Amino acid sequence: MSESKQFKRSVFFISDGTAITAETLGHSLLAQFPNVDFDIHIMPYITTEEAAMAVVVEINKCQTRDGCLPLVFDTLVDPHVREIINTAKAVNLDVFEGLISKLEQELGTPPTTLVGQTHAVTDSEYYKARIDAVHFALDNDDGARTRHYDKADLILIGVSRSGKTPTSIYLSLQFGIRVANYPLTEEDLDDNRLPAVLREHRSKLFGLMIDAERLVAIRSERKANSRYASFSQCQMELRAIEGIYISEGIKYLNVTEMSIEEISTRILQMTGLKRRIG
């Protein structure tokens, strides 16, 4: 039986760019403390001293309200802006500080200290690969189109609401992989075999599994008290689709306790697919 949340803690992700780096690292660390309820604040593009001072005001307000020090993850390059943030009543966890100095010492060259470089669009081919992959994922979502499956790097399959769409989008956005996804319906499962449109692309298929209890909860958000969201229906579909995975020799993964990031990384590992970007 899981423990209940113990208390709430304010967290700030601060950056002179998109804040994606600070947020990604911060969430990975915070996930190790499931009994703490975190109140997340994302502060991107903090590039001036004025903006930094405004953030300090917000941090201090949270400290007064919560009665404990907020946690601050930042990827600020400008030392003047960083010094201002460090005056806040908070626990400052500078993502770059320490790492940059160690790299500078090892590489024998000073850093550029250019702000916002992490996600700058500097390589047009890199950018195009990302955008093309995202467009492909959107155009080939949920079995809407199947005629371009020959161009897919990967085709995710699973029952309805098992995480196919968000995983497809993440793989395309983060790694530039062309991903289609196809839901196996009750009719497909009754046949106890892959639909014809998928059989010719068997080598590209990867299955998602999820525990019945979790699937019930997800489906109930859309259609509460329906047959679609009932435990018996979810259990029946999951047993049937796992049988297809096994009989057809399709690799699959139970994603119940996994984040999208974990799911995507495991899929790359299990399939041997190479990222096009990142």
From Swiss-Prot:
Annotated family: Belongs to the pyruvate, phosphate/water dikinase regulatory protein family. PSRP subfamily.
Keywords carried by this UniProt record: Kinase, Nucleotide-binding, Serine/threonine-protein kinase, Transferase
Keyword Iron in annotation: no
Coiled coil: none
One of the Pfam families matching this protein, by short name: Kinase-PPPase
InterPro entries to which the protein is assigned, alphabetical: Kinase-pyrophosphorylase, PSRP
Record-listed E.C. numbers: 2.7.11.33, 2.7.4.28
Catalytic activity: [pyruvate, water dikinase] + ADP = [pyruvate, water dikinase]-phosphate + AMP + H(+); [pyruvate, water dikinase]-phosphate + phosphate + H(+) = [pyruvate, water dikinase] + diphosphate
PANTHER family cross-referenced by the UniProt entry: PYRUVATE, PHOSPHATE DIKINASE REGULATORY PROTEIN 1, CHLOROPLASTIC
Name of this protein: Putative phosphoenolpyruvate synthase regulatory protein
GO molecular function, one term: protein serine/threonine kinase activity
Record's function text: Bifunctional serine/threonine kinase and phosphorylase involved in the regulation of the phosphoenolpyruvate synthase (PEPS) by catalyzing its phosphorylation/dephosphorylation.
Binding site for ADP: 158-165
Keyword flag Transferase: yes
Superkingdom: Bacteria
